[in-house]
A protein has these predicted regions:
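Hydrophobic alpha-helical segments within soluble ligand-binding/sensing domains
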Residues: 39-64, 76-77, 104-108, 156-159, ...
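Hydrophobic alpha-helical
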Residues: 1-17, 82, 95-96, 101-161
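Hinge/cleft segment of the Venus flytrap/periplasmic-binding protein
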Residues: 85-86, 175-221
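Flexible loop/hinge segments that line or gate small-molecule binding clefts
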Residues: 6-46, 57, 63, 154-165, ...
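Structural detector of well-ordered beta-strand residues that form the stable sheet scaffold
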Residues: 24, 65, 95, 125, ...
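Short, solvent-exposed amphipathic alpha-helices that sit
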Residues: 47-51, 74-92, 106, 110, ...
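Second-shell loop/turn segments in exported
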Residues: 35-39, 68-72, 95-99, 120-122
Length: 221
């Protein structure tokens, strides 16, 4: 399962536990980890760290907008990794934050409003690629002339294409095929009565214009 609400899924997990049904969580953790057998996730915190470090190499100072999704642990961790990395650097300022629920349709109007309220935006850190795309569309619709660094997390085909077009600055790569394969392996081992790792964390890398040519633009990793 891939929970939309990391706390709200508790009743379903309890029902599965009661019937001794193994539960494998993929992509984002649940709050009640004792109710699941295996959690397979990207290193979401590190994804945020990588975006922040790249930004700091490109900008000596910045006014930053954050696009979040507080109901998912993965989204929270990505933003936390970013904010922790810049915390001791006063030259990087978070000037606004909006929960977009990870959706392009919510990101676009919220960023349009933020652009109207803030004239000097340097960086937009998005919890995933769809919200980054919404941010880019908002900047375009408002005719925002200043170059803005826009980061996402996913490594989606569309995100990589936008990087090749110099529209998106970077995206921290997820490996959904690896996560899926790990989930199937864990399921077989659980059904066979074998011991399995409680948590599997898959490392991340950052895709930018400097290395995007190393990746397949037509498919996920």
């Amino acid at each position: 399962m891939n929970p939309v609400d990391w706390k709200g899924v508790k009743k379903g997990l309890e029902a599965a536990k009661k019937k001794n049904i193994p539960v494998i969580v993929v992509d984002t953790e649940v709050y009640d980890t004792d109710l699941v057998d295996v959690t397979i996730v990207t290193d979401n915190y590190q994804a945020g760290v990588l975006c922040a470090k790249d930004m700091m190499e490109r900008q000596k100072e910045a006014n930053i907008l954050l696009l979040t999704h507080d109901k998912t642990k993965s989204g929270r961790d990505r933003i936390q990794g970013f904010t922790d990395t810049i915390q001791s650097h006063n030259e990087y300022k978070i000037i606004a934050m909006e929960d977009t629920q990870g959706q392009i349709e919510r990101s676009l109007p919220k960023v349009e409003k933020m652009v109207e309220e803030h004239e000097d935006i340097d960086v937009i850190m998005s919890l995933n690629d769809p919200t980054a795309m919404g941010a880019l569309a908002a900047l375009d619709s408002k005719g925002y002339k200043k170059d803005v660094l826009v980061y996402g997390v996913d490594g989606s085909p569309e995100g990589k294409r936008l990087i090749t077009e110099s529209k998106m600055t970077g995206t921290a790569v997820q490996y959904p095929r690896k996560m899926g394969a790990s989930a199937i392996k864990a399921a077989y081992e659980l059904l066979a009565g074998k011991d399995v790792d409680k948590t599997v964390t898959i490392p991340v890398k950052l895709i930018t214009k400097e290395n995007v040519s190393e990746y397949d633009l037509e498919r996920w990793q």
